[in-house]
């Protein structure tokens, strides 16, 4: 990352209205969509998504800004909801009649601490990033999936996730076509994002291949994305099995999840809000 110096003070966050305070516009000129550098940036991201299922943009957020985001995330820890769930990799109910080795009998464990959008302070840098039209347009251009909108849910639109020692995201396939995350702080060890490309297909859950992988991960090539602060990642996880490996050590693994959808006005129902945030209202 190219930005150096001290972190932006918390008091200054309220005044950080310029995108250049947050994003390294020298590396990522997302504020000028009509130039050759921007077009090359988008084309490269699309190509990586097509070939690898993930497009990473290291140093997207400046060092000073990402350090301030980390400080803010740690301060939010006491307000976070601890989410703990045992689930199949498909997020389908466990089927007890299946043989013990079947993927629909195998339970993964996910545990994380989450700050809902409503709990992230107004004027914070991570809110500024999410609310930026230039960032939205850039993500929209790279994903190339039709018009995108910011999620309208007061809890789910933007989340900060803290992973303490032993916490993880178990192996799973996403229910959405894509995800957008920002790495804010790396743990002392562990916490890597690991994935296996296209382990299932549209209309075919590929139970045999998935089961073999769960028995012996060496049957597939596991790709690894280390947690590097300031990196923006776009990932297609509907057909690629993935996880966050267990975190090791006292330093939190911190990332932000920026939620975008293909139609305006999308919100969670009360059940989903209670499940993921422990409450139904902001």
Residue ranges, per PLM feature:
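Fe(II)/2-oxoglutarate
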Residues: 1-51, 280-282
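Short functional linear motifs
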Residues: 46, 66-67, 136, 178
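Short, solvent-exposed beta-strand-terminating loops
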Residues: 70-71, 75-96, 196
């Amino acid at each position: 990352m190219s930005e150096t110096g001290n972190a932006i003070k918390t008091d200054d966050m309220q005044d950080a209205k310029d995108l250049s305070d947050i994003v390294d516009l020298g590396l990522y000129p997302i504020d000028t969509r009509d130039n050759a550098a921007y077009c090359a940036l988008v084309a490269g991201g699309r190509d990586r998504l097509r070939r690898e299922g993930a497009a990473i943009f290291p140093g997207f957020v400046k060092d000073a800004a990402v350090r301030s985001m980390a400080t803010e995330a740690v301060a939010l820890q006491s307000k976070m909801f601890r989410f703990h769930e045992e689930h199949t990799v498909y997020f389908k109910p466990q089927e007890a009649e299946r043989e013990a080795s079947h993927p629909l009998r195998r339970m993964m464990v996910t545990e994380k601490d989450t700050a809902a959008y409503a709990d992230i302070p107004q004027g914070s840098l991570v809110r500024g990033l999410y609310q930026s039209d230039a960032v939205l347009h850039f993500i929209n251009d790279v994903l190339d999936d039709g018009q995108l909108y910011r999620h309208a849910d007061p809890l789910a639109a933007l989340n900060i996730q803290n992973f303490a020692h032993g916490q993880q995201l178990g192996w799973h396939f996403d229910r959405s076509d894509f995800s957008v995350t920002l790495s804010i702080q790396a743990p002392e060890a562990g916490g890597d994002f690991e994935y296996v490309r296209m382990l299932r297909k549209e209309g075919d859950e590929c139970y045999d291949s998935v089961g073999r992988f769960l028995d012996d991960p060496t049957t597939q090539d596991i790709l690894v994305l280390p947690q590097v602060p300031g990196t923006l990642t776009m990932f297609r996880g509907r057909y690629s099995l993935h996880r966050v490996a267990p975190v090791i050590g006292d330093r939190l693994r911190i990332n932000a999840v920026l939620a975008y959808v293909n139609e305006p006005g999308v919100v969670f129902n009360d059940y989903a809000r209670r499940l993921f945030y422990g409450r139904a209202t902001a």
